[in-house]
Amino acid sequence: MSNSNARPVSLGEYLAHLPLSDEQRAELASCSSFSELHQRLAADPAAGPAEAVQASVGPRLTVGSAAELEDAEMLGVDGSGRLCLKIAPPIKRTKVVPEPWRTNVLIRMWRRMTGRPNAPQPPKRELPPARWRTVGSIRRYILLALMIGQTIVAGWYMKGILPYQGWSFVDLDEILSQSLWDTVVQVWPYALQTSILILFGILFCWVSAGFWTALMGFLELLTGRDKYKISGSSAGNEPIAPEARTALVMPICNEDVPRVFAGLRATFESVAASGNLDRFDFFVLSDTNDTDIAVAEQQAWLDVCRETKGFGRIFYRRRRRRVKRKSGNLDDFCRRWGGEYKYMVVLDADSVMSGECLSSLVRLMEANPDAGIIQTGPKASGMDTLYARMQQFATRVYGPLFTAGLHFWQLGESHYWGHNAIIRMKPFIEHCALAPLPGKGAFAGAILSHDFVEAALMRRAGWGVWIAYDLPGSYEELPPNLLDELKRDRRWCHGNLMNFRLFLVKGMHPVHRAVFLTGVMSYLSAPLWFLFLVLSTALLATNTLMEPQYFIEPYQLYPLWPQWHPEKAVALFSTTIVLLFLPKLLSVILIWAKGAVEFGGRIKVTLSMLMEMLFSMLLAPVRMIFHTRFVLAAFLGWAATWNSPQRDDDSTPWSEAVRRHGPQTLLGIAWAALVAWLNPSFLWWLAPIVGSLVLSIPVSVISSRTRLGLAAKDEKLFLIPEEYATPQELLATDQYTHENRWHALHDGFVRAVVDPRQNALACAMATARHGQAAPIEALRAERVAKAMEVGPKGLDLNTRLALLSDPVALTRLHEQVWAEHNAAWIDVWRASIKNDPHSPLLPLHPESEGQPVLAGA
């Protein structure tokens, strides 16, 4: 029970955490109880303990900064008269209705045959005729012909390499008349070879697509004569019309708060420097369900608004019902505020964009009224581990070729990657809301990889989707180590497999059907490659352990010898190597031609390329095994979660590497031993695969070290232009990240309950504005009582979230913790603030170091 009338020694400690003047603190120190303290803060001497602490939220929040918040018109009251911060603009709802998916072709055909029309689709516009559409279709037919032709030739060579030439010597009548074992012995080698040949054709066609994409990107970038690039449609200096309002939205969920708000601040300041700030608003859309992180987000939002004078321009909202993950978060924004903006730029938690880039995107949208989405090509930067720096180098050197190549083949029917892109709001709201996939199981429910689907729906609705591959000023970060990358890949794998259910949905453009197919192949190629290697090993075992059948026809006069053509094997191997590695060589040639200084010079960039090629060869089999596991997990319905421990230096501990890579190492050893037993000479061909698996543990650990990454940077290895001449936005992001980490708020939920100002901020930003109905009051009392009884460590997540979202319950818990001197809460709070920059403004009272006692006790 609350004992507010006794005078606690901790009253001075409470006042020490309010930014009061000496006179104000001395005056309030004379209060005889917490009730009187809150009454005097609220200027309401008649208020009871619970009412007084609620009424004091405003003074506790604004003390020392009232003018700042009032000038920005940030203070308001809710329907119950409680003070609240205007952390988001007024809601003006827009109708957002997702169209149900009709994924079953047979049902659609049956309904048509029985005269039952399918449900009408929302009206869609036709993309106006344009020359680029005809050119794009011709280019894609050429690409298809090149891929198929190249695959047929390679398949013919592969067929000649295999020892058993065709099924013509297999007699069906003889098979039906002989024993099952004899049939298996006779057919098995041919079945293996046929399976290997089919898998080879699929994989070679996949490699061929990447090769031709990179080659055309190389020619586009080398000549600079791309008359269809969308960035050429704007002069780049046109004034932005007042009605072209753009919302920058950053959906986040349990992210690194210092880094998120550092990037947001750098982007905001760059937009302000461009002179177009009045055309942009910024929204942080949080789906965070970790209460400590949620409170840190609140404080970070307040800090960044103060530091940039961004009140009324930078907004924050945390959803309490996390429906449909990221796509649901964007739907919620569109429903509440989307009608107020003409365009929306979606940022990732690690995105940074320059003001000029953002302004250029708006100008391009204005100049191209048929464009629905314009995607930039984000440049990876900002990480220092050896693994991340090699990946940054690879994406920065090779990535532009593939991005330009994608644009060459797709033109205005291209990709959207979910971030660092501008979207036209009206068609997005009308056509791109995502309904859950029908049915049950792992591939039903909320869509995980929303970006490809939204691009397909935008094009289906008659709007273009473009890649502005040459637009500078768009940045992102990559995972710091292999295991973090694989954790991300598991989500993407499941999402891309789900998206393939939309392959036959009515109205999808063929290009986006191909995008769904390539999304699947990005991960399905791994188990296909693994199966190819397993079958090749099985064929080796067959040739080694089974006696060859030289006479398989009645009255056969001459033996049927297995055939080997090593010259064809060498030719095919050389061709495959060219397809895999020529794009990397072309990338370096392009850098030589354009200027290699920003990459460390010609020698260093070439050496970096060779080292990266070796590293990618080491990691390819490791990724193959993991991606195979991810695909199997998705089909078996295993949950797509992977909880990695926190790593301050972003490095991988040996224990985690052994746990994650141990099975691969054992597989590599066993596989190598089997092949060595079957045919030691074949081990040389398999060595790159099994050797990589055996070395996966040390490679994963060593490549995650920041020290090695910085040492390589000092030697100008894996250098990228953003490290050679760092843009101002990235410099600012790095500076603000370090500052934010220094001022990071720890134990946020405890701070929101105990700390006077943090509690006031949390109450003013709480989103649940319930009334005083009896059931609600009973639930509040139950939650507060439970929190007082079990303390912060005993509270479950749902109770924490409910308390943080309810300003009434949070103020009552705050009052009771201090009035009853609840050690479980106050001791954790004291420990949290000892080394925290958000420390008391005055030294703690000596008596407050231990358990507070009542005055006169």
Swiss-Prot record:
Pfam families: Glycos_transf_2 (PF00535). CDD domains: Glucan_BSP_MdoH. The keyword Cell inner membrane applies. One of its GO terms (molecular function) is hexosyltransferase activity. Pathway: Glycan metabolism; osmoregulated periplasmic glucan (OPG) biosynthesis. The chain crosses the membrane at residues 142-162, 196-216, 515-535, 572-592, 606-626, 682-702. It is found in: Cell inner membrane. It is a multi-pass membrane protein. GO terms for cellular component: plasma membrane. One of its GO terms (biological process) is glucan biosynthetic process. HAMAP family: MdoH_OpgH. This is Glucans biosynthesis glucosyltransferase H.
